[in-house]
């Protein structure tokens, strides 16, 4: 209690000092600065009464605190929402470290009996969800010892501000075993940090203690088995230079018109769009010479012999198919009678990518060579050609609306039946209950910093509310490096399918898809089944990443920002089926299962005459 009074006095003196300094400033009539009601009050009165407060909720899910309750000063009515504000103060060694705004709510919206609160204090209620992993500019709470206090500020009808600081009070009944502990992580391309966060009740000060201890801080690249880093960096640079030199030499050789290359740094086998284009090419019974250069990750090393082979076949192939970001090819000048074709792995156009992100956090340099040498890009509809042209920095004439080959799968009834039967045989539990598939995109600026903050999911509540009717599958983006860490007591409900390669197969056995900003919504829409957009950070995502369309009008399903909202939508089946049909017809020109045919017809066997080059070998 003594510490609360000290904190209050410091805040009060600071605000009085600021007020005196401000009153010495002559405000010119032409000065059109706008202040909040709390910043332009005539004077501040230090309250002499102990405020009334009660905590109705103090629960933790990972590093996320949900706090609610009420607080008011006797004799100071709170009838108007815009005349009161409350904050949770974090105090380190007696000094205010930071303050988190609390959302003001009417007291009758709280989950406890508030009949003893006089009607004059209608806006005494508050609630907030605070993520301590993202507290400081998207970084965790720094290492240190903190105490929590509540602050209330209220402006009366005479434009006088009243302010009070008080302890949170005894919330030990909300803490199992009188203590709570969790871990926090921070991911970026150059830094990985891990913390322990310990929460307990301070009997002396009658408030909450937070103890944050840093466990680890390391450069993620050091976690890779890479001895002799400087030497390896030199060797990689040398190998890359040799690759470029070899490519230029091999360009002097004739193009082999029946040679087709498939290259990817995100798959080890011929799956996805590659699979459907490859199978269509086999149907044509032509004498194709196929070459495959496949790696599971952009981090996988390529040996010098591999690079020489790639240089030769890239230089002498008629067509090179890629399906993702493929950096080694971007500095190359593609030959006049050859094609570099991007069979982009994502369908539709949703969140901005590539050069559409110039100027945004993690966006590319305008002078980058990435993507610009594509001679062809395939997309799902005419409506999105302009977005892919902008994102890849290519002419719109190079973007062709053939449809996306892997979506042919959804129109092949025999193949769908076979896949479903195979899945039910391999995973019998998929048949017993309805299936929820959780498939969000990653957070971070790219592969090196990719992660997902699983603490935003309330595992316990999802389990208790949905386990009788559903099972919950995780299909996390392959870039994500942190794990869901499913608690063992929920292992009959949560299942991790992140290593399952083809998400389109899982969509067949899915009853409800939960995603956020992932392009999986386009393919799932072809099945006309319900989806939920769990976008807890949509405001931040719009600011940092942005979209090609207004997100709230775009999504063909309800928006949920919390686990509670997600559960409510599922249990009450509040889905937006009526929006799915128009969504599908905007992002897909052809719903016939013949996208692979069109890709082969328009790229491998184009109808128009091409200029003849005497360096092109005949089959």
Swiss-Prot record:
Pfam families: Glyphos_transf. It is found in: Cell membrane. GO terms for biological process: cell wall organization; teichoic acid biosynthetic process. Its main location: membrane. Keywords: Cell membrane, Cell wall biogenesis/degradation, Membrane, Teichoic acid biosynthesis, Transferase. It is a peripheral membrane protein. Responsible for the polymerization of the main chain of the major teichoic acid by sequential transfer of ribitol phosphate units from CDP-ribitol to the glycerol phosphate attached to the disaccharide linkage unit. Synthesizes polymers of up to 40 ribitol phosphate units in length. This is Teichoic acid poly(ribitol-phosphate) polymerase. It comes from Bacillus spizizenii (strain ATCC 23059 / NRRL B-14472 / W23) (Bacillus subtilis subsp. spizizenii). The lineage of its organism: Bacteria, Bacillati, Bacillota, Bacilli, Bacillales.
């Amino acid at each position: 209690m003594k510490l609360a009074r000290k904190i209050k006095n410091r805040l009060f003196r600071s605000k009085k000092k600021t007020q005196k300094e401000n009153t010495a400033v002559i405000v010119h009539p032409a000065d059109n600065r706008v202040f909040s009601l709390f910043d332009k009050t005539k004077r501040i009165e230090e309250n002499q009464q102990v405020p009334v407060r009660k905590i109705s909720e103090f629960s933790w899910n990972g590093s996320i605190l949900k706090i609610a309750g009420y607080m008011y000063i006797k004799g100071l009515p709170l009838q108007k929402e815009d005349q009161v504000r409350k904050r949770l103060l974090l105090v380190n060694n007696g000094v205010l470290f930071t303050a988190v705004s609390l959302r003001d709510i009417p007291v009758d919206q709280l989950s406890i009996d508030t009949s003893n609160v006089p009607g004059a204090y209608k806006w005494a209620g508050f609630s907030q969800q605070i993520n301590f992993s993202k507290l400081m500019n998207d970084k965790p709470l720094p290492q240190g010892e903190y105490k929590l206090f509540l602050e209330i500020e209220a402006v009366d009808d005479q434009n006088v501000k009243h302010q009070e600081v008080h302890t949170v009070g005894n919330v030990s009944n909300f803490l199992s075993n009188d203590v709570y502990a969790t871990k926090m992580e921070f991911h970026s391309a150059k830094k990985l940090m891990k913390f322990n966060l310990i929460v307990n009740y301070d009997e002396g000060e009658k408030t909450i203690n937070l103890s944050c201890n840093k466990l680890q801080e390391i450069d993620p690249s050091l976690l890779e088995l890479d001895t002799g880093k400087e030497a390896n960096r030199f060797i990689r640079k040398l190998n890359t230079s040799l690759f470029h030199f070899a490519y230029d030499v091999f360009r002097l050789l004739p193009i082999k018109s029946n040679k087709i290359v498939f290259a990817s740094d995100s798959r080890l086998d011929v799956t996805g769009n590659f699979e459907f284009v490859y199978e269509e090419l086999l149907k044509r019974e032509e004498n194709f010479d196929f070459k495959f250069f496949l790696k599971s990750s952009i981090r996988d090393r390529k040996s010098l012999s591999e690079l020489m082979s790639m240089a030769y076949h890239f230089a002498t192939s008629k067509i090179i198919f890629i399906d993702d970001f493929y950096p080694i090819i971007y500095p190359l000048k593609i030959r006049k009678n050859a094609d570099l074709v991007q069979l982009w792995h994502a369908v539709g156009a949703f969140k901005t990518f590539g050069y559409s992100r110039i100027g945004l956090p993690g966006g590319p340099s305008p002078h980058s060579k990435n993507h610009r040498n594509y001679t062809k890009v395939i997309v799902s509809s005419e409506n999105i050609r302009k977005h892919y042209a902008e994102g890849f920095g290519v002419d719109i004439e190079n973007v062709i609306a053939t449809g996306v080959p892997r979506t042919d799968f959804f129109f092949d009834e025999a193949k769908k039946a076979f896949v479903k039967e195979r899945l039910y045989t391999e995973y019998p539990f998929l048949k017993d209950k309805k299936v929820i598939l959780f498939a969000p995109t990653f957070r971070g600026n790219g592969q090196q910093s990719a992660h997902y903050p699983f603490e935003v999911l309330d595992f316990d509540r999802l389990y208790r509310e949905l386990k009788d009717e559903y099972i919950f599958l995780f299909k996390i983006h392959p870039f994500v490096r942190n794990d869901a860490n499913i608690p063992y007591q929920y292992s009959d409900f949560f299942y991790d399918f992140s290593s399952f390669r083809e998400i389109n197969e899982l969509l067949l056995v899915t009853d409800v898809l939960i995603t956020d900003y992932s392009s999986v919504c386009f393919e799932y829409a072809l099945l006309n089944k319900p989806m939920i957009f769990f976008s807890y950070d949509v405001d931040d995502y719009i600011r940092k990443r942005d979209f090609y369309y207004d997100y709230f009008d775009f999504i063909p399903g309800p928006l949920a920002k919390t686990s509670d909202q997600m559960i409510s939508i599922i249990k009450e089946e509040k889905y937006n089926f009526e929006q799915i049909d128009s969504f599908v017809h905007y992002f897909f020109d052809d719903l016939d299962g013949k996208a692979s045919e069109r890709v082969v017809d328009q790229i491998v066997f184009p109808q128009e005459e091409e200029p003849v080059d005497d360096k092109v070998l005949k089959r």
